[in-house]
């Protein structure tokens, strides 16, 4: 298991798939990193040399990933809430932020249904 950006990556998977285990790196970013470092994307992580692993670590260290990215996203949401903007209000109330309908649907964001009181 290679440890990159504080994450233990599965060594039996292909490099581009293993990199997606890092928060902030998706398929397209993983492919771009592999092409920039001349790493064949379908080589297993355990087959990489120590030099290539070090290059991979240095390349990922330049990106905003894991804790730093999570912190920045939460700070952005907190900023919206503090501004009192409409988006901040929706975040605070736990409702959909991007204009989706809420009369029906939006159950994931709103949580389980509240029981209607019998009269």
From Swiss-Prot:
This is Small ribosomal subunit protein uS13. GO terms for cellular component: cytosol; small ribosomal subunit. Located at the top of the head of the 30S subunit, it contacts several helices of the 16S rRNA. In the 70S ribosome it contacts the 23S rRNA (bridge B1a) and protein L5 of the 50S subunit (bridge B1b), connecting the 2 subunits; these bridges are implicated in subunit movement. Contacts the tRNAs in the A and P-sites. Residues 92-119 are annotated as: Disordered. It comes from Nitrosomonas eutropha (strain DSM 101675 / C91 / Nm57). Keywords: Ribonucleoprotein, Ribosomal protein, RNA-binding, rRNA-binding, tRNA-binding. GO terms for biological process: translation. The gene is rpsM. PANTHER family: 30S RIBOSOMAL PROTEIN S13/40S RIBOSOMAL PROTEIN S18 (PTHR10871), SMALL RIBOSOMAL SUBUNIT PROTEIN US13M (PTHR10871:SF1). Belongs to the universal ribosomal protein uS13 family. One of its GO terms (molecular function) is rRNA binding. The keyword Cell membrane does not apply.
């Amino acid at each position: 298991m290679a440890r990159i950006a504080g994450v233990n990556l599965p060594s039996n998977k292909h490099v581009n798939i293993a990199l997606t285990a890092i928060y902030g790196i998706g398929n397209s970013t993983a492919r771009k990193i592999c092409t920039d470092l001349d790493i064949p994307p379908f080589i297993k992580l355990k087959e990489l040399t120590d030099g290539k692993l070090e290059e991979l670590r240095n390349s990922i260290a330049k990106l905003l990933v894991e804790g730093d990215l999570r912190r920045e996203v939460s700070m952005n949401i907190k900023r919206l809430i503090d501004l009192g903007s409409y988006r901040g209000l929706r975040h605070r109330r736990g409702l959909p932020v991007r204009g989706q309908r809420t009369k029906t649907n939006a159950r994931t964001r709103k949580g389980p249904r509240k029981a209607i009181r019998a009269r």
